[in-house]
Amino acid sequence: MTATTSATLTDGREARLRPLRCGDRERIVAAFDRLSEESRYRRFFAPLHQLSDRSLEYLTDIDHSDHEAIIALDPGTDELIGVARYVRGEPHGDRAEAAVVVADDWQHVGLGRALLERLVARARAEGISRFTAIVQADNRRALELLAEIGPTSRSLEGNLVELDIELPDERVGTALAAALRAAAGSIFGVRPLSERLLRAAHELSETRRSGP
């Protein structure tokens, strides 16, 4: 679970992958600050200018079982350049919500694929057999490729599709890897996670407003 591995990307660059650690809080903040407005919107489905303390606690306080996060680091700068995470729907259940985000200048080179492969392996090791994910409805290539794997899907609010993905027993198959490459600029499974983050930020704001 703590091992660091390397991934060679399609443009020849290398990335280091490992599970998130408690000391990565500042890396999370810095990575968020570097995201473009479009990437932030796709990740959180709402304009978000900064992460609240409560949001950061949620993102970094993980148990590596019901909540897991795999991060990618730039070997040259040690900056965080990508995160894939799952959150189990209920303790020890066999389903989890999944999300992937990649730094703007590391998109479309296979980093999302590498992160997802590692995340699926961790999920399988923890007894998770299915991921739910959210993809924008106009991301046709990703939807078509994911459908080849056998997910059921339904439209949400007209422009979003929820996917139910059966995880492979071993490494992510070629079709799923290709789907992630096709959607490298999109985020899988962000809506449920983003709603929790935005709710936490709103609650924190209300608490401060009503305080002394």
Language-model features: locations:
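Long, contiguous binding/interaction regions
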Residues: 1-212
